[in-house]
Amino acid sequence: MSKIVKVLGREIIDSRGNPTVEAEVHLEGGFVGMAAAPSGASTGSREALELRDGDKARFLGKGVLKAIEAVNGAIADALVGKDAKDQAAIDAIMIELDGTENKSKFGANAILAVSLANAKAAAASKGMPLYEHIAELNGTAGQFSMPLPMMNIINGGEHADNNVDIQEFMIQPVGAKTLKEAVRMGAEVFHNLAKVLKSKGYNTAVGDEGGFAPNLKSNAEALEVIAEAVAAAGYVLGKDVTLAMDCAASEFFDKEAGIYNMKGEGKTFTSEEFNHYLAGLVEQFPIVSIEDGLDESDWAGFAHQTQLLGDKIQLVGDDLFVTNTKILAEGIEKGIANSILIKFNQIGSLTETLAAIKMAKDAGYTAVISHRSGETEDATIADLAVGTAAGQIKTGSMSRSDRVAKYNQLIRIEEALAGRAPFNGLKEVKGQA
């Protein structure tokens, strides 16, 4: 009853008004899975390729009809008649058929949408929720946990039209006992942050990921206003709520000059100077996690950063590792960072995503499941976080339905698991157990 009978692709719209790929996989017995590919703004140069049409007369060149054609043509032809329960085989067929290193023939957006839709269809045919099916695929059947959210409540960098260089300032409700309580705490801090910003005359418009995007005097001021909001919500900073940042430093790295140019503050740094700048913020605020603290190619700088901060806080590689096991293996061998951000469209299939999570965990690295800045209502990452017991999730702020869809799915899953998925809070963060 899990044989594929039809594969269908369509062009839908993401949260930035750009087209993306949605796929349906239909099985014998009437079981159907549907999934959509997300899209990033600050992308690593070694990510799998997102195939766009380039026809300026449609969607300013961002159409995905070529990827849809691949789904409805070559991919559908290859998968009809195959067993959807064998996820590894389904993904391998698509990867082999594409035949390129970075999935540039069909597009990672096409392959991923089908990969995830297939997993959903297989779960339906087994009569189980997606997170349970993912746990079985992962070889960890029945082992679940609820992830600690990293909530991006101030957006800067490529995610906002403001003068803040650092891309994300996040809170983690570590004092919560459950995921549902963590969401409530995050919402309370978010609403209090709106009041704090308004009281200072700042704009409260939101960025791509639902966080506020004001023009601020400095990156440190972003942390200061969040600290005020945490206190105003009745929580203790460092005890109930901790802080995290995504620098997305590749976006302000001047490759020719070899310097980090923070235009918002009018400052430039060498790698070593920027590492010490970050270390100063860690001393000043209860920051427990920093993502992409340097440019993706600055491995010598990352080695220094890991020496400087790696035993104190979590250092997450996003553009650095791009959910790629080859690159992650090199990072592990060289002692670079201590955590990986998991974005399945960076690599382009569920099987490869699970392999990256496993490699990280086996090496003592943490794995943080993440959305992209261009999202849809698809909430698969919530099931991925629970089904792999990854421990942490990054899925935006407390506004925009493309973000809260994931939190709402986590609330439903926690309720369904009724105590079988512990919420471990700060223990999940590298260096904080």
Swiss-Prot record:
Enzyme Commission number: 4.2.1.11
**For this protein, what does the record note about how its cofactor is bound?**
Binds a second Mg(2+) ion via substrate during catalysis.
Q: What is its main location?
A: cytoplasm
The domain of life is Bacteria
Kindly list the places in or outside the cell where this protein is found, as annotated in its UniProt entry.
Answer: Cytoplasm; Secreted; Cell surface
Keyword annotations from UniProtKB, A to Z: Cytoplasm, Glycolysis, Lyase, Magnesium, Metal-binding, Secreted
GO BP terms:
glycolytic process
Give residues annotated as binding Mg(2+): 246, 291, 318
Q: Where does (2R)-2-phosphoglycerate bind?
A: 167, 343, 372-373, 394
Q: Which PROSITE patterns match?
A: ENOLASE
A GO CC term assigned to this protein in UniProt: phosphopyruvate hydratase complex
The parts of the chain that form a coiled coil are none
Q: According to its UniProt record, which cofactors does this protein need?
A: Mg(2+)
Q: Which reaction does it catalyse?
A: (2R)-2-phosphoglycerate = phosphoenolpyruvate + H2O
Q: Where is the active site?
A: 209, 343
The enzyme's first-digit EC class, named in words, is: lyase
Q: Give the metabolic or biological pathway.
A: Carbohydrate degradation; glycolysis; pyruvate from D-glyceraldehyde 3-phosphate: step 4/5
Complex and partners: Component of the RNA degradosome, a multiprotein complex involved in RNA processing and mRNA degradation.
Q: Name the PANTHER family on file.
A: ENOLASE (PTHR11902:SF1)
Name this protein carries in UniProt? Enolase
Q: Which gene encodes it?
A: eno
